[in-house]
C-alpha cells in the first residue's frame, strides 16, 4: 500500500467516526504548496466556511504559502469565519495527515481564535 492510499484509509476511518457523532467538522488538507481548511455541516453536503492559502488576500500577506506561519493565518481566518456563521464547536478532521507541523499549527491557531475541539 502506498503513502497516499494509507492516508486516505486513515481519513475514511476518522470521518466514519465523526459522522456517527453528527458533528460539524473542521477539515484540513495540505499540499506541498498550499493549506486548505473547511468547516463542513454534519450532513456533509454543505460547506459553512472555507479558507486557504490560495486566496489572493492571504497570499499577499504571507511570504510563503507552505509554512507554519501560513497555516496559523489560515487557522485564525477559518475560526473567525466559522464563528461569524454561529459555529463554535467542531470535530477536527486532519484528513489522515499526521498532527504535526502545518496541521498542528492550524489547529492551535483555530483554538486560540475561539473554535472548540
Curated annotation (Swiss-Prot):
Keyword rRNA-binding among UniProt keywords: yes
Keyword line: Ribonucleoprotein, Ribosomal protein, RNA-binding, rRNA-binding
Any single GO BP term: translation
CDD domains (alphabetical): Ribosomal_L18_L5e
InterPro entries: Ribosomal_uL18_bac-type (IPR004389), Ribosomal_uL18_bac/euk (IPR005484)
Gene3D superfamilies: 3.30.420.100
GO cellular component: cytosolic large ribosomal subunit
Pfam families cross-referenced by the UniProt entry: Ribosomal_L18p
Entry keyword annotation includes rRNA-binding: yes
GO molecular function: 5S rRNA binding; structural constituent of ribosome
Its biological purpose: This is one of the proteins that bind and probably mediate the attachment of the 5S RNA into the large ribosomal subunit, where it forms part of the central protuberance.
Alphabetical list of HAMAP family matching this protein: Ribosomal_uL18_B
UniProt subunit comment: Part of the 50S ribosomal subunit; part of the 5S rRNA/L5/L18/L25 subcomplex. Contacts the 5S and 23S rRNAs.
Family designation: Belongs to the universal ribosomal protein uL18 family.
Protein name as annotated: Large ribosomal subunit protein uL18
Protein source organism: Aliivibrio fischeri (strain ATCC 700601 / ES114)
Gene: rplR
Amino acid at each position: 500500500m502506498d503513502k497516499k492510499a494509507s492516508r486516505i484509509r486513515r481519513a475514511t476511518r476518522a470521518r466514519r467516526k465523526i459522522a456517527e457523532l453528527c458533528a460539524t467538522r473542521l477539515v484540513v488538507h495540505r499540499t506541498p504548496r498550499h493549506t486548505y481548511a473547511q468547516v463542513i455541516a454534519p450532513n456533509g453536503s454543505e460547506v459553512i466556511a472555507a479558507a486557504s492559502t490560495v486566496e489572493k488576500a492571504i497570499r499577499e500577506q504571507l511570504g510563503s504559502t507552505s509554512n507554519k506561519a501560513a497555516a496559523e493565518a489560515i487557522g485564525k481566518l477559518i475560526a473567525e469565519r466559522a464563528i461569524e456563521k454561529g459555529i463554535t464547536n467542531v470535530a477536527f478532521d486532519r484528513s489522515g495527515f499526521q498532527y504535526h507541523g502545518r496541521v498542528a499549527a492550524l489547529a492551535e491557531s483555530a483554538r486560540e481564535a475561539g473554535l472548540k475541539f
